[in-house]
Amino acid sequence: MNRTYIQEVPKEIGNTIKVQGFIENLRNSKAMAFIVLKDITGKLQITVEKADHPELVDTIDKLTPDSVITVTGKVVENDYVKMGGIEMIPSEIEIESIADALPIVRKEIAATKKKKAVERSSIDQRIDYRWIDLRTDENQLMFKAQSCFVNAMRKFLLDRSFIEIHTPKLIAAASESGSEVFKVDYFDRNAYLAQSPQFYKQMAMAAGFERIFETGPFFRAEKSYTNKHSTEFSGFDLEFSYITSYRDVMKMEEELLTAGLKAVKEAYGDQIKELFGQEVIVPETPFPVVKLADLYKGLEEEFGYTVDESEKGDLTTEAERLSYEWVKKHYNHEFLFITDYSAEKRAFYHMRDENGVPQGYDLIWRGVEITTGAQREHRYEVLKKQAEEKGLAEDVKFYLEFFQYGCPPHGGFGLGIDRLTMLLCGLSIKDAEFLFRGPNRLTP
C-alpha cells in the first residue's frame, strides 16, 4: 500500500490507507489511546479503543513522543475531533524509530494545578539539537514560506529571460573587503571563501549573458554578535545589462520582491499571522526613495537623532532602525530605498556620477538593510582608477580584465535569503537559518 500524505486524508473518508510520521502528542489511558501524528503536510488523530484492538496495546505502550510510526487504518468522520473532524481507526501500527526523552524544550509549557511551568530552552540549546527543534510547526512553516518566496522570485526572473548560473565559492581574491574573508589553504597557495558572487556576476555580463541570477552560500568573516549577522548565509543575487541608471535596478528589485511577497501571502499569509503574529504585506510600487542626507535631516527633525559629520556618508545602525518609523509615517510603507552614499563607503566597482556620487542604493525593509545595489562601472580605465584609489588594483587584476574586451553597461544587487526569512517571520537570524553559523558556532 502506498503512503498517503496527511493533507490528502480528507479525500479518503471510508477508505483504508497508510500514513507515516512523527508522534507529536500521545495520550495513553487504560481504555483509550490518542495519537496525534504529524508529517510535513499536516496532522491526524489516531484513535484506539483498546478493547476493540487488543493486538495493538503492546505496541502503543512502547510509544514515546517524537517516535516515528507507520499506521494503517480506516479514515472516519468524527465531529468531536478538532483536526478537521476526521480521525483514523488503526488496524496496524508499526514502530519505525523510538525517540528517547527529548534534551530540549521546544515550546514553553504553561503551569497547571499539578505541575509547574516549563520554560522553553534557549536558542543556543535548541541549535545544539536543531534537528529536533526544526520539527515544530513554526520552523516548518518558516521554511515552506522561504521556499515559496525564493521559488516565486526565481520564476519571476526566468519569465523575464534571466539565466541561472552557479559561480565559484573558492576565489583567488576578496570580492569586497579583505578583512572579512575566510582564508583557506589551496594546495600551494591561499584561497578565500566567496563573500558574494560579485566579480563573476559581472563576468557573465562581459560574456554577453545579459541577465543572470544565482542562489547559493556565501561567507563573511565578521566577528559580529547581532541578531541579523551570520558568517555563512544564503544569497540571492542578480545582474543585468543595458540599463540606463541604477533606477532600473531599483525597479527590478521592487517588482521582484513584490512578486515574492504576493506568492507568500497567498500560500501562507494566514498561517504566518497565526503562528508568528506577522502580517505579510504585499507592498505598493514604486517604493519610497530618499537621499541619505535627507534621511538624516528627517531623523533629526522627528526623533532628535544626530550623528557626527564624519558618519553621515553611511547609514548607522540606529538610523537604519529609525528609518522604518520614518517611512511608515511619511509613506505608510515597509520598504525604503536610500541613495547618495559617500564614495568612501561604497565598493570601488560602483559607478559614480560627475560629482563623484556612487550610483547605487541600500534597500531597508522593516528597519533592516536587505540589499546593496548599484549600477556598476563598466569602463575599464575608470574602473581601474577607482580600484587604484582604494589600493586594490593589483589584487583584482584578473577582475579588471573582464572589462578590457568590451562590456555593456549593467547593474545588480544581492539579497540575503535568511535575512528576508527573518524579517518575514519576525525572528532573529539564529532562528531563521537552517543551521546558524557565527563566530562561536560551527556545529552541528
Tell where the protein language model's regions lie, with residue ranges.
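Class II aminoacyl-tRNA synthetase-like tRNA-binding/catalytic domains
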Residues: 2-243, 435
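Juxtamembrane/interface motifs at transmembrane-helix termini
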Residues: 108-110, 269-271, 419
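Cytochrome P450 heme-thiolate monooxygenase catalytic core
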Residues: 164-166, 272-276, 338
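Flexible helix-coil linker/hinge segments at domain or subdomain boundaries
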Residues: 259-273
